[in-house]
Amino acid sequence: AGEFVYDRPFLWGSRRTGPDLHREGGKRGDAWHFKHMYNPRLTSEKSIMPRYPWLVANELDLSKTKDKINLMKNVFGVPYSPAQVDSLDAWVKNQSVGIANRIVSEDSDIKKQIETQKAEKGKDFIPLENREVVALIAYLQRLGTDIKTAEVKTASN
C-alpha cells in the first residue's frame, strides 16, 4: 500500500497473527487505543494480545526526533519541507496535547486515573501528553489515512 512507502524498516510481512492495522487510522477513538495498549481485554474480551502497561507509564524521549526526521528526509527521500522540520517541536507538542485531551474527554475513568496519579506523584508525575502511548496512538491514527483517492469520471457517472 502506498501510504507505507516511507516506513523504515518495512513493517508489513506476510505472516498474520493479529488484525491488519493498515487501515486503522480514525476507526476508533484515542481512549480506546489507550485502554487497548494498557490491557487489550478491556476493549476486546478474547484478545490474545499482550498488555503494554509501560507504554502508558513511560515518558517519551524526543531528544533524537529531529535527527530521525532529517535522516528520513536526507537518506530515504521522505518529502519533509524545511518548514516542517523547523516547526517539529511545536507540531509534536500540539499533536500530543490534542491526543491527551481527547483521551480524557472520551473516557471519564481514564481522566480520574490521570488526576489521581497527578495528585499522588506530585513533581514526579508525567503529563499524559508526554507518555510513549500517545506517540503510538498518533501513529496508529495515521495508518491508512495518507492515501487520498480521486473520483474517476466514467461513462456511468
Predicted feature residues:
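Periplasmic c-type cytochrome electron-transfer domains
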Residues: 1-157
